[in-house]
Structure formats: C-alpha cells, structure tokens
C-alpha cells in the first residue's frame, strides 16, 4: 500500500513535562533541596537518558525526511548508572545531599539499557545533542 510508518523505542526521557516521580526528577529535586538521595540495590542499573528536545528533533526528522520507515531506538549517549546519576546531581548542584543505599534489593541491578543509534542515524540523520549534565542543570532550574 506504500504507507511508510515508523515506531520509536524511547529510552528514559528527561526534561520539561516528564513524570516527576521517576528517578531523574526525583534525584535532581532532592539534590537541589539538600535531601538524601536513596538508592536501592547497588545502584548499578544503567539507563540511557534522552532529553525531550532530542526526542522532538528525532520525530521532526522522521516526519520530514521522507526516509523514516521501521522501528527505531530513540535514545542518546547519556548512559549512566543510578549511582552515577546521584553523584552527578550532587556534584553539579553543589549539594550537601548524601547518597544512601536503602538496603532494599533492586531486581534490575546490573541491567544495562544502552541501545544502538546506528539505524536512526543512518535513516534520518538523528544525532542527540543534549548531555546529561545539561539536562540536570536545566531541570534543577525548573524545579
């Protein structure tokens, strides 16, 4: 039928409008307020955070490139562990927050969600631009 379709597997979105109960906004807000950052397990779960502006850019490219067709990973190069995210928040926000391990198990410890961007880059020219550090500082200024 000649209808081109594209689906996107979006990794962990960050930025304006994201669910405030997820780990990224929670850690940024707590670090900004000097509250303790609580980690489950070893804090070794790795996620790749992608800013909503990068998501919008990819969707725009998909719509207007005329080349998008298939399933794409929509992510960035911001793969960090939960512990690294906590440390970045404390450092960048010059916070007195402590990073505390709850003692509770995280069934996803050692899980790594870091996907290839090769397909989306080749097909529509998507390249993420916003670094995790920029996203943390931006969210802190909004919170």
Model segments located where?
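Short beta-loop-alpha junction of Rossmann-like oxidoreductase domains
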Residues: 16-23
């Amino acid at each position: 039928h000649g209808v081109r379709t594209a689906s996107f597997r979006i990794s962990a979105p960050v930025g304006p409008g994201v669910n405030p109960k997820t780990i990224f906004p929670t850690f940024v807000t707590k670090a900004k307020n000097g509250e303790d950052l609580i980690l489950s397990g070893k804090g070794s779960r790795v996620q790749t955070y992608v800013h909503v502006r990068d998501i919008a850019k990819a969707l725009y490219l998909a719509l207007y490139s005329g080349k998008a067709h298939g399933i794409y990973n929509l992510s960035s190069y911001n793969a960090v562990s939960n512990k690294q995210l906590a440390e970045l928040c404390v450092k960048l926000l010059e916070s007195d927050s402590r990073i505390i391990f709850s003692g509770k198990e995280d069934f996803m410890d050692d899980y790594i969600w870091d996907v290839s961007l090769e397909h989306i880059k080749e097909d529509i020219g998507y390249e993420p631009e916003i670094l995790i550090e920029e996203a943390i500082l931006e969210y802190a200024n909004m919170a």
